[in-house]
Amino acid sequence: MSSQPQLALEASQAASSTRDGVIPAVNYWIGAVEAVYRASAQGKNSHMEIVSKAQSELEYIEKQIDQLQVAAANNQEARQQLENLHKRIDSLRRQMAGRLTAWERTELARHPMRPYPLDYIERIFPNFSEIHGDRGFADDPALIGGMAQFHGREVMVIGTQKGRDTKQRVYRNFGQPNPEGYRKALRLMKFAEKWGRPVVTLVDVVGAYPGLGAEERGQAEAIARNLREMARLRVPYVAVITGEGGSGGALAIAVADRVLMMENSIYSVISVEGCASIMWRDSTKKEIAAEALKITAKDNLELGIADELIPEPAGGAHHDYDAAASAVADALEKHLSQLEKLPVETLLAERYKKFRNMAQYFQVVS
C-alpha cells in the first residue's frame, strides 16, 4: 500500500479549491470513502475489496486528523470540526462492521496489531505477578499466568501470548502452547481453587502446538486432563476469547462458567484453511469454509456456546486498546459478580449443564 492512498490525492486537489484548505479537504476525503462504500453496499463492487480499501483510507485519514489536531491546539473551532470528522469515521467503521463476512472477521481476529492477553492484563489487572513452570518439564512462554487484582478482588489470570515481532513470536512459539503450557495452566487453576480465587482466562490461540516433541510429551493427555479438571473447578471461572479461539488449544483453557467473545473474535473446531483443504481439497475456499463453520462471535452466541458478545471500538480492537480493555473489564465485572453469589455446587452443576447442552446431533435409523 502506498504511503498516500488514492483518495488522498483527490482530497489534496479539493484542498486547493477550498477557502480554508485542509479541513474541507479532509471532509471531502471522508465523503469520498463513504461514497465508495455505499457503492459496495449496492453490490456494484466486491465488498471484501472495498472494505480493505476503505479501511486503508480511513487509517490514513485518522493519522492526518491527529496531526491536524496538534497543529490546531489553540483553535477551538478547528478542533471541534476535526472531532466531528473523527465521529464520521467511527460511524462509517461501524457501518462496515455490520456487514463484515465471517472471513473478514477472521482477518480482524488475526490482525497483527490486535491487543494480546498481556495488553489486556496491563490495562485491567494491576499488580499482576506471573508464575512460571509446570513443575514437571519446563516453562512455556506461549502460555502466561499469575495472580492479580481486579476491582478489589484477587484473581488468577491465564492467557496465551503470540508475540509482536519475529524474536517474540519465536520465543512465544507463535502463541501455540506445548503440553507443559497446559499443565502450567492447570497448576495455576488448582492453585486458585485452593485459595478460593476466581479464574479468568484470555484466549487468543490458533491451536495447540502439533510438533513431534509436544506429541511425545503428551499433548492430547494434557488437554484432556484440563477439560476434566476445569469441569469440576470449585471457583468462579470466566473465559474471554479475545482473538482466535482455535480448536482444542483454546478449549483447554476455556471450559468456564461464562464464555465471552470479543465482537471480532472467532471460535472454531478447526482453522478455516484446514477446513477448506479437507472439505473442498482447496485452501482458497476459506471464505466459504468460514461461513459454514459458524465461527464468529454472533454465531457462537446464537448457538449457545458463547454467553456474551463484547463490543469493540469502531474498526476493531486494534484501533483503541484502552477502549477494548475497558469493555472486557466491564463484562468481567458483571459476570464475576453474578458467579460469586452462587453456591459451589450450583456453580458446578450449571457449568456441567452448559457444556452438555452445547452439542446437536441427528440420529439416523436405517
Task: Enumerate the predicted regions with their spans.
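Intrinsically disordered, low-complexity segments enriched in small/flexible residues
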Residues: M1, W29, V33-Y37, G43-E154, ...
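Conserved catalytic cores of soluble enzyme domains
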Residues: E49, V203-E333, S337, K341
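Glycine-rich beta-alpha loop segments
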Residues: G98, R123, N127, F137-D139, ...
